[in-house]
Amino acid sequence: MKQLLFTLLVILSFSNCTAQKPSYEDEIKLVQYELNTQYADTDKSPLTKEDLKSFKALEFFNIDKNYRIEASFELTPNTPIFEMQTTTDRLPLYRKYGIARFTLNGKELALSIYQNQKLMENIEYEDYLFIPFNDTTNGSSSYGGGRYIDINMPSEGSTTVVIDFNKAYNPYCAYNGKYSCPIPPSENKLAVAILAGVKAYGKHH
């Protein structure tokens, strides 16, 4: 925890010493700090009690702004509600909210964006959208079951959406088998390496 606190102080000190808006790198470092703080908290952490005893910090890919993508966005109205597969027999209800299209490393790619039907009833999450995805790093430098990105609903009439892979995080199942986690649909399998966001857990901790 001391290491996490030191990291936050460095970020805040740098930001306070300049009149400028915090840099993109500082923004992502703060996201990483908040995630590490959550995982170090015995009341909020998905880690097993045994892993929590030795937990210091999650491992991340280097921050790379090239993985902050401004994608074209297409709404998909009136798409059917469906049961998303999970790592257990739980089948949460989702609807495809839209499609994001972008180019990365010379490849034309697309990701479906989903809306959880239960969460949308909660005012706190009414604009929450979910992007589960797989990429070619899964099973090696990243978790084999894929990773997730959360975004806010684009403003009405928007034709673009920002997808920041530096904010990609692991399902709780990557840390503890007691959880039930959505499995990324096959349409969200990217044929590129996403060298951004959280790395696989358990290889170097």
Where would I find each of the regions flagged by the language model?
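Acidic, glycine-rich flexible loop segments
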Residues: F130-Y169
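Intrinsic-disorder/low-complexity, polar/charged segments enriched in Ser/Thr/Lys/Arg/Asp/Glu/Gln
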Residues: N66-R68, Y97-I99, T160-V162, K189
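A mature extracytoplasmic/lumenal domain signature
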Residues: F73, I113-Q117, D135-T137, F165-Y169, ...
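Bacterial Sec-dependent N-terminal signal peptides
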Residues: M1-S23
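Extended, aromatic/histidine-rich regions of cofactor-dependent oxidoreductases associated
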Residues: K21, E25, A168-H205
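Short, surface-exposed linear segments at secondary-structure transitions and domain or protein termini
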Residues: K118-E126, I151-T160, G202
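Start-of-domain marker
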Residues: Q20-N78
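Mid-length scaffold segments of soluble, non-membrane domains
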Residues: P77-G145
